[in-house]
Amino acid sequence: MPASWRAGMTVALALAVCAAAPCRAHGATSSQRPATGPLGGVNVIGLYSGVSPAVADRQIAAARKLHAKVVRAELRWSTLEPVRPNDVDAAALAFTDRLVGAAAAAGIRVIFTVDSTPCWASSAPASLLRNCVPRKSTPANAWPPTDPASYAAAVAYLAHRYGAKLAGIEIWNEPDQSNQVYFAGPNKAQRYAAILKAAYTSIKQADPSVRVLAGSLVGSNGLFLRALYARGIKGYYDGLSVHFYSLTLASVRAIHEVQLANGDSRPLWLDEFGWSSCFPAQRIQEEQACVTARIQAQNLADAIRSLSGTPWVAAAVVYHLQDTAHENFGLIAASGRRKPAFAALSQALLRPYARPHRVTLALLRRGAKIVAAGSGPVGDYMELEAFVGGVLRYRALFILNRFNRYTIPLPRVLGTRAIQVRVYQYWAGLAGAALARI
């Protein structure tokens, strides 16, 4: 879920050097293209106390119109087994049965993200446990279980009950968050690794076909993932899930490079990403992902199509199906009106290999200066290279602003004539470069 907004794309930033080798594309080439695109889908409302099974029907009907292959839903363990172990709440089960059943009938599979520790299992301090009430959200729910086996039993139950109707079971939500909202307490990597190992073993015993998704990471610097590798998690998951909201493609690439450096070939599941259509009425917590409704639609389509040629990305799941009172990440407004993003994502999931928006470039004279200006596809760093007399004289690394545009003044030392400029996105590489001369 969006929090601690990741490195925004609200300003264009340029870092210049004199010369360096050009970067190659970091997506897949056409020869590497998988037979089918990643499992495209959308996040939907999951299991929490009081949710109506009818909500499941409406969400799956919308997901089907999106051509979604998967939906991702949070499943709160504290709602599933609120009072004691192995005592599954009947109302909770009615919702999950309805969601999984409706999805299966529509040809859609479900990713369950299982988090939120029940009071009886929580490792929270006594001061928090005293105020922990079953079926109510409290700070104690964010603390991991005292015994990982209790969590493992719950996810094994889900694997046994739903089996092949699940796309996967994601082990917790965002344990590397710097806040204490989802995974509280000390020694996070150590405790998460213990939960993951117990969960993987139990799920595979219940149904070996059910995928186990580890990580649920928000950080792309690799620190938490390296800490997990040091605690022996390799071999205890089928996919590594990540949640990247800013510089989505660059973040996916960065975490994949950490995987490769550690001999990890499991695919990435980008099962939470998106943009909020809150501009210009910005909300503080959404500032760095805040765009217009039109840009939200464009970004989602471009991201899906950029990722579709990447064999090591198994899924791309947009956050979220519908706006809430606090967030505008949805494809559908809180009123029920479809936003432009709904149609854009539907077309992208139907035609995932269509080309993303191209890089554009114009060289403009502004007094005694030359300015490079244009636009590009969202998600990664951009590179500008300026040549004089066929020699590379200037390079700028930058990111697009919230409207996917850029303006880069060229250094005056380059002069104002016989300049050739090339701009490209790292992910797409030189094949997608825009060229201009002046």
Where are these regions (language model features)?
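Bacterial N-terminal signal peptides that target proteins for export
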Residues: 1-11
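Bacterial N-terminal signal peptides
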Residues: 9-20
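C-terminal region of N-terminal signal peptides and the immediate post-cleavage residues
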Residues: 18-40
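Hydrophobic faces of well-ordered beta-strands that scaffold small-molecule active sites
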Residues: 38-44, 69-73, 110-114, 167-171, ...
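Active-site cleft segment of glycoside hydrolase catalytic domains centered on the general acid/base Glu
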Residues: 51-55, 81-95, 122-239, 244-264, ...
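Catalytic domains of carbohydrate-active enzymes, especially glycoside hydrolases
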Residues: 55-78, 106-113
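Aromatic-rich peripheral "rim/lid" segments of glycoside hydrolase catalytic domains that contact
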Residues: 128-131, 175, 280, 295, ...
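Low-complexity, Ser/Thr/Pro-rich intrinsically disordered linker/stalk segments at domain junctions
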Residues: 341-438
